[in-house]
Amino acid sequence: MNFLLTWIHWGLAALLYFHNAKVLQAAPAQGDGERQQGEVIPFLKVYERSICRPVETMVDIFQEYPDEVEYIFKPSCVALMRCGGCCNDEALECVPTEMYNVTMEVMKLKPFQSQHIHPVSFQQHSKCECRPKKDIRNKDNHCEPCSERRKHLYKQDPLTCKCSCKAPDLRCKSKQLELNERTCRCERPRR
């Protein structure tokens, strides 16, 4: 009986979702300016806003560049599209399936020395899906860490286990250096 009710519940939710998907694609998340305070927001709108999708998120620059401790960034955080929302199953999490880099100008201050506006690259998420949580995955599927030393320099694709450098090549080139893919460090070009 519970199984049947669960299927009916999800079927109804899916029907409502797909029926109104066109309308909500263009609607912003805070687009309820015309609603009166205290008015009840309908279930469908609440449900559609909670699904796993890219949403604008404020990200601390030091979270993305933990090695840049000698600088103060202005602004200290930037608005990026990142995966967020619910998966309606405790064993799943909302993760990015497509990403791209965006470059933003931020001010880098070195206290009592200098301040310059620099291009800084960040990763944005363009598509998201609900996937099994890392700690629940089968051990056969588990990815080995990128590097025991300097783990913070790498990012890892949870699907392919491929490791790549967090530091964008553009950051190194702006300093007339080259990115060493093996060490994920900016180095002087070899002649």
UniProtKB/Swiss-Prot annotation:
GO terms for cellular component: extracellular space; membrane. Glycans are attached at N101. Pfam families: PDGF, VEGF_C. Keywords: Angiogenesis, Developmental protein, Differentiation, Disulfide bond, Glycoprotein, Growth factor, Heparin-binding, Mitogen, Secreted, Signal. GO terms for molecular function: chemoattractant activity; growth factor activity; heparin binding; vascular endothelial growth factor receptor binding. Residues 1-26 form the signal peptide. One of its GO terms (biological process) is vascular endothelial growth factor signaling pathway. It is found in: Secreted. Expressed by the venom gland, and probably other tissues. Disulfide bonds join C52-C94, C83-C128, C87-C130. Its main location: secreted. The keyword tRNA processing does not apply. Transmembrane segments: none annotated. The keyword DNA-binding does not apply. Homodimer; disulfide-linked. Also found as heterodimer with PGF. Belongs to the PDGF/VEGF growth factor family. Growth factor active in angiogenesis, vasculogenesis and endothelial cell growth. Induces endothelial cell proliferation, promotes cell migration, inhibits apoptosis and induces permeabilization of blood vessels. Binds to heparan sulfate and heparin. This is Vascular endothelial growth factor A.
